[in-house]
Curated annotation (Swiss-Prot):
EC category name: hydrolase
UniProt source species: Onion yellows phytoplasma (strain OY-M)
Residue ranges constituting the tr-type G domain according to the UniProt record: 10-204
Subunit-level organization: Monomer.
Subcellular location: Cytoplasm
Annotated spans, G5: 174-176
Function description: GTP hydrolase that promotes the GTP-dependent binding of aminoacyl-tRNA to the A-site of ribosomes during protein biosynthesis.
Cross-referenced InterPro entries: EF-Tu_GTP-bd (IPR041709), EF-Tu_GTPase (IPR050055), EFTu-like_2 (IPR004161), EFTU_2 (IPR033720), G_TR_CS (IPR031157), P-loop_NTPase (IPR027417), Small_GTP-bd (IPR005225), T_Tr_GTP-bd_dom (IPR000795)
EC number(s) given by UniProt: 3.6.5.3
Keyword Repressor: no
Name under which the protein is recorded: Elongation factor Tu
Length: 394
């Protein structure tokens, strides 16, 4: 039997639930699917179906993640929910599930907790553009004044991390009561869904962003010239376009004279395509794996940056011991390993396996990176951590 076809008749958005353990993230995810299933826009997923998340591997790291999909009248949503706190940290840092927006779930009965803060900080550092708040368990804390205080605390915390705390929509409800079919609380879940549709803009599609393709391989075709192959990360490219070769060496411009996929000429290549690009006036030794082809001026080479990283535990196949400033692992960006030196920040003296830390990294060679670029940290070919560039320093 053929797979069901994915019909692209609505804008697509990636969302996820974030927040402290036991504040109701998974229950809310189940409630959203149940409420939408009554309108024929989702398959209802029970709590234990979502909680029993399969393991996935991303950048050499195992992460438990549940993917749920649903539609509204306006959009198609892919919703990610992680069972454990460590899974959230790993998921957000590796970019395993890129979020266009997050639903921050805070228990009205408990208010802000340590992971509430940590997830907001992570959302800021990995570049989640929008957050909406669902104040959950309001049935357990019916005192209006207490809920007002909790809401104020959440808004202040969001502002502290540069989200527009005063303007972010806060919906009060009870995911459990909504699941049980209580009409008042079902209405609150509907309000949350409507807020997702209206408060979050359609994301700029990858194909509309400036062209970028990491170079995976380079070879010469006799009589035609040098071809570089790779997967287009974003944007589009066609024969006649001017591009820059960025990273590792001096940036240089060239013209793409042909684009091919599976030995056939393409009118244009776009995000997601695996292609070969024929370059004018470029020799085999002028370009190498680890560089990128990009729209001129859209990306610059950098060698120093601040990063947010997650360090694997021994059980996850990571280091058995802590590391300190001057640690020199390899940083794997897109298609290549580059050695770099780590400096720990603030009063942090060492980073232990399992830690989530902020580091300053100086690479031996400059490469094409931007805020939000993801990388792995490797030692002797095995992954010991994952990171995301949070700020460029040169």
């Amino acid at each position: 039997m053929a797979n069901e076809k994915f019909i692209r008749n609505k804008p697509h958005l990636n969302v996820g639930t974030i927040g402290h353990v036991d504040h109701g993230k998974t229950t809310l995810t189940a409630a959203i699917t149940q409420v939408l299933s009554t309108r024929g826009l989702a398959k209802s997923r029970a709590y234990d179906q979502i909680d029993n998340a399969p393991e996935e591997r991303e950048r050499g790291i195992t992460i438990k993640t549940s993917h749920v999909e649903y539609e509204t009248e306006k959009r198609h949503y892919a919703h990610v929910d992680c069972p454990g706190h460590a899974d959230y940290v790993k998921n957000m840092i590796t970019g395993a599930a890129q979020m266009d927006a997050a639903i921050l779930v805070v228990s009205g009965a408990d208010s802000v907790m340590p992971q509430t803060r940590e997830h907001i900080l992570l959302a800021r550092q990995v570049g989640v553009p929008k957050i909406v708040v669902f104040l959950n368990k309001c049935d357990l804390s019916p005192d209006e004044q207490i809920l007002e205080l909790v809401e104020m605390e959440v808004r202040e915390l969001l502002s502290q991390y540069d989200f527009p705390g005063d303007d972010i929509p806060v919906i009060r409800g009870s995911a459990l009561k909504a699941l049980e079919g209580d009409a008042h609380y079902v209405a609150q879940v509907n309000e949350l869904i409507e807020t997702l549709d209206t408060y979050i803009e359609d994301p700029v599609r990858e194909v509309d962003k400036p062209f970028l393709m990491p170079v995976e391989d380079v070879f010469t075709i006799t009589g035609r010239g040098t071809v570089v192959t790779g997967r287009v990360e974003r944007g589009q490219v066609k024969a006649g376009d001017e591009v820059e070769i960025v990273g590792l060496k001096e940036t240089r411009k060239t013209i793409v004279t042909a684009v091919e996929m599976f030995k056939k000429d393409l009118d244009f290549a776009q995000a997601g395509d695996n292609v070969g690009a024929l370059l004018r006036g470029i020799n085999r030794e002028d370009v190498q794996r680890g560089q990128v082809l990009a729209k001129p001026g859209s990306v610059k080479p950098h060698s120093k940056f601040v990063a947010q990283v997650y360090v694997l535990t021994k059980e996850e196949g990571g280091r058995h011991t802590a590391f300190f400033s001057q640690y020199r692992p390899q940083f794997y960006f897109r298609t290549t390993d580059i050695t770099g030196v780590v400096e720990l920040q603030g009063d942090v003296k060492m980073v232990m396996p399992g830690d989530n830390a902020e580091l300053v990294v100086t690479l031996n060679n400059p490469i094409a990176i931007e805020e939000g670029t993801k990388f792995s940290i490797r030692e002797g070919g095995k992954t010991v951590g994952a990171g995301s560039v949070s700020k460029l320093l040169n």
